[in-house]
């Protein structure tokens, strides 16, 4: 779901992904190709990424301006999670969905306000993308 808002000369996009948040690094597989080990995302993560993209409507052109990507994660259980790994998953999904041109530090300049909460009834991820204006 996409919501476009404008506040005080700042454009903001809001996405809601009504799926249990997943991390890329905690669900990896090691396979061997020509005798060399290679780490790939698990089928659980690939499924999450594919399903999450159904809830993301990209803008006409990917964002190339500096933005803050705030993500609020609502987990189904109270187990400990790594916020950095969750944020990496979000930015990867946004790049693959062509919302962001890239997830480098020239475009995603911060994750200010990102948090992890508990909501057993409705696990989800709320993503707020706010344009950063140079003062």
Predicted feature locations:
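Acidic, proline/glycine-enriched N-terminal capping motif
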Residues: 2-135
